[in-house]
């Protein structure tokens, strides 16, 4: 049995410092980022103080699905939405934006079927809820060629982490298991022997795809994973840790550390290097991890910093919340939602 090694006291103090900093400004963030933070903190602590962020998330998912149902019956609005999404990537000159525009302009339905609809349905499913138009939405999912999507190398080069999420979400809601297909495509898209050909952005995209296989398999920090289910990922992280530390962003590095912790691999030399790196990345005066460009944007830094909080003072994964186990958290549901 693997025993958990207690984190260093300075790591705990730093984690708590970042956590307090973000909790003080939490409601200045978008609902999406509030819930991203609150849900992860709830799954680490089971503290009911995060109920407000979870209720806001439920309301937001309901509104987004209500709007999507309307758009699906109004072609002009749906086309306009897709055009706006594509335009936002077309304006970007960075490699990620260029790749996403070029890949997704050929598959525009990806925006509203996979990035939006599937995401919202899976989140509600997590909470033990469903939308009143659940049957209609499932029909839309069944009409989308997910097999082609998860076999597409160009889409993988643009959206690796998102595709990992989507493969596991479909499995979660009972609409097909494409997890093995996506993993095979990820391996074919990024063979290890060709790492030297990757740009820094594509190296990061590869790593994000790998970490999100682990994180999605855990139900997003709800339960542990088995190393034996993903041996190639853990072997890669161990063998390439020095390159990862040299070229990856803090978000990715922290997710790799959390991937080890989710598998109970607390004494990994690679994990010790990661913890040291993330701890040293924290600006103790600003109480957060800055971006790779030195930005201390509170909003843009939420993802990076909630990962640092968890990494430096890891508790354990906890399931939920859901309406069956935590009914008081889900009182006064939006009219369009019911228990599953």
Where are these regions (language model features)?
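Terminal, non-catalytic domain-edge segments
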Residues: 2-70, 74, 78-83, 87, ...
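Eukaryote-skewed repeat-based solenoidal scaffolds used as protein-protein interaction platforms
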Residues: 95-251, 261-263, 272
